[in-house]
Design a protein with these regions (language model features):
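Oxidoreductase cofactor-interface core, primarily capturing Rossmann-like NAD(P)-dependent enzymes
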Residues: 8, 19-146, 157-166, 171
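A hydrophobic C-terminal alpha-helical subdomain
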Residues: 116, 154-228
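Surface-exposed patches in mature extracellular/periplasmic domains of secreted proteins
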Residues: 147-148, 224
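A structural alpha-helix within SAM-dependent methyltransferase catalytic domains
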Residues: 2-6
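Short beta-strand segments at enzyme active-site cores
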Residues: 14-16
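Short acidic/polar active-site loop segments enriched in Thr and Asp
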Residues: 11
């Protein structure tokens, strides 16, 4: 696709990176399919000489999407949660709105465009913990969630087991995504872990409570019942 973009005269390419930090070799080692993302960036770098610029966005987990489809280990309908370790590991996450704002800003603002030119860029709506999200969910729902726990090492073991040769079960892949995002290694803590430049998004961003309050009624069909 990058070669087709060059042939068509496209000047800027945003690859399908969105998500975990693929500049971290440990993350790519845990998630072997992400080697393909690394190879794509290597190819884009080889086409810079042909006038093709690129920006790769690291967003962390999709916050609103993760709440909708239980990727953050919260079942909003059943009022249950699976908390990794003590629930205090920090992870940066982005909503779809934040991702759209970042892309618009990169193309509309010359300073941001220069920051992002031929670079990996980090963005985030929030950097938070599972405990903070759980607190917001219980406040919005007015209901105490039933909590079970998993240790980081056990999540990694189960994920690797599912990814054994010949096993096509995506459950293992998603477990390893959660291991990277929610485990005690804090691979996705943009505020404290060194790595690519973080773009300061000019538009005001939502808080954890804002996102939870917006998504809870959409997912459950219930009205917000907790404290305001």
């Amino acid at each position: 696709m990058a070669d087709a973009a060059v042939a068509a005269g496209v000047q800027w390419f945003i690859p399908s990176e969105f998500g975990h930090d693929t500049t971290n070799p440990r993350v790519v080692e845990v998630l072997p399919p992400f080697y393909e993302k690394v190879k794509i960036i290597d190819h884009l770098r080889s086409r810079e000489k042909d006038g093709l610029n690129w920006t790769s966005l690291h967003t962390g987990f999709f916050f609103d999407f993760g709440l909708t489809f239980d990727l953050l280990e919260f079942d909003l309908r059943q009022k249950t949660a699976v908390i990794w370790d003590d629930g205090n590991s920090r992870s940066s996450m982005s909503t779809f709105k934040t991702i759209a704002q970042a892309i618009i800003q990169i193309f509309a603002d010359p300073t941001s465009r220069e920051e992002a030119k031929n670079q990996y860029i980090r963005i985030a709506t929030v950097t938070t913990t599972q405990n903070e999200i759980l607190q917001a969910l219980e406040r919005v729902s007015g209901t105490k969630f039933q909590v079970t726990r998993i240790e980081t090492a056990e999540g990694k073991r189960l994920g690797d087991q599912h990814l054994a040769p010949g096993d096509k079960d995506l459950a293992g892949f998603f477990l390893l995504l959660k291991y990277v995002a929610l485990g005690k290694n804090e691979f996705l803590d943009w505020e404290n872990r060194s790595g690519p430049h973080r773009l300061a998004i000019k538009a005001q961003q939502e808080s954890v409570l804002d996102v939870v309050g917006r998504m809870y009624p959409k997912v459950t069909g219930e009205v917000e019942r907790g404290e305001q």
